[in-house]
Amino acid sequence: MSHGFTKEEVAEFQAAFNRFDKNKDGHISVEELGDVMKQLGKNLPEKDLKALISKLDTDGDGKISFEEFLTAIEKYKKGHRAGELRAVFNVLDQNGDGYITVDELKESLSKLGESLSQEELEDMIRVADVDQDGKVKYEEFVRLHVEN
């Protein structure tokens, strides 16, 4: 049930969930979500609140459990991480052709003050280069960062 979060993170999320769960039944209802949104200065119509809950409510009971709450946070974090990976890839892919080459990696690292040998640079590309074409495409770049 940890979703890859540390014990400390789960405890933090549980505390936040408990603040939303006013009646302490282990679920966030439409009414409780509405109260939270009002506290945040957003007075959403009930249909919008129900739509929001339905996006997170994986078991279809019309409420958000702590497990569903964690799943939503996990999806958000993964989406955020994917955006960060895309941004880094785009910086390394200096000519914008969708690939990182040894030369682009060398240029990028030298701008950061890193000086690696040609062999070290080629090894870095080789580790990520699943299809062995001598360059790293975005999917390979993501796989490298997800697996490590």
Swiss-Prot record:
- Which UniProt keywords are given for this protein, alphabetically ordered? Calcium, Metal-binding, Repeat
Positions of Ca(2+) 1 binding: D21, N23, D25, H27, E32
Q: Which cysteines are joined by disulfide bonds?
A: none
Q: Name one GO molecular function term.
A: calcium ion binding
This protein is called what?
A: Calmodulin-4
Residues the record lists as binding Ca(2+) 2: D57, D59, D61, K63, E68
Q: Which CDD domains match?
A: EFh
Residues that, per the record, bind Ca(2+) 3: D93, N95, D97, Y99, E104
Quote the InterPro entries the UniProt record gives.
CALM/Myosin/TropC-like, EF-hand-dom_pair, EF_Hand_1_Ca_BS, EF_hand_dom
Function according to Swiss-Prot or TrEMBL: Implicated in the early stage of ectopic ossification.
